[in-house]
Amino acid sequence: MKLRGLLLGAAVALTMAPPALAERASDGNVSIIYWQAPSILNPYLSGGTKDIESSSLVIEPLGRYDQTGALVAYLAEDIPTVANGGVSADLTSITWTLKKGLKWSDGSPVTSADVKFTADYCMNPDMGCAQLAAFDGIESIKVVDDLTVTVNFDAPKPNPYGPFMGGQSPIIQKAQFENCVGAAAPGCTEQNFGPIGTGPFVVTEFRPNDVIQYKANDN
C-alpha cells in the first residue's frame, strides 16, 4: 500500500483511535494522535517534542542517530569522520557533502547554500533560536561548492556532530526563509506553519494546537 496522506492531531477520544486508524489505513491514509497537538512546524522556534517530531516529516537533517545510537547519513552522502577525511585531524572542522539530486518539495535543488543559511539563521543573535546549543563553538561556515560545506570550530571539537544532526537541527530552504531572519523569524507564519522540505510529506493544512494534514511529497 502506498501511503497518500497523513493526519496528525490531538487526542480527543482515545477509545476511538484504533478503529479510526484501521479505517484510514485501508484507503491509503494514516492518522497519528498525540496527547497534545503541535503548535509550530519550525524546530528552531520550539524545543517541544511534538513540534520537532511533526516537522521531521517535512524537513530533514544531514544525519540522524539510529535506535542503537549510531550515526546515519540522511541528506548527506556519508557521515564525515577523521578516517574518511571529513573531519580534520585536529578536530577543528567538519566537511559535509550533500547527496546528488536532492530536491525540495517545490522541485528546486537542495544546495550547500541552504545548509549554510540554516546555521546562519539559528545563530543570528536576534533570533532566540531554540536549538542554538547545537551550533555552539562554530567560528565560520564555508560553502565549498554546490554540494559541499565546511564548518569551522573555534577550538577542537571531539564531537562535531551538533549542527545538522537529528530532528532538532534540520536543513531549511534559504529561498523560503531568507526574509525571516533574526527578530523577524517568529512572525513568518506561512514559513513556520508550512516549511518547504525534503521529507516524505508536504503540509496541506495546519491548525495550530489542533490538527495537521499532510500529503505525500512528489519530489
Model-derived segments and spans:
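Sec/Tat signal peptide C-region and signal peptidase I cleavage site
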Residues: P18-A22
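Gly/Pro-rich hinge or "lid" segments in bacterial periplasmic/extracellular proteins
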Residues: D66-A70, G166-N219
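N-terminal lobe/hinge region of extracytoplasmic solute-binding protein
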Residues: I33-V87, D120, I196
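Short, well-ordered beta-strand elements
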Residues: D27-A37, E77, T92-T97, V115-T118, ...
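Bacterial N-terminal signal peptides that target proteins for export
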Residues: M1-L7
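Aromatic- and charge-enriched surface segment that lines or borders ligand/interaction sites
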Residues: D78-G128, V144, T150-N152
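Bacterial N-terminal signal peptides
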Residues: G9-T15
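Surface-exposed binding/hinge segments that line
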Residues: L132-V181, P200, E205-R207
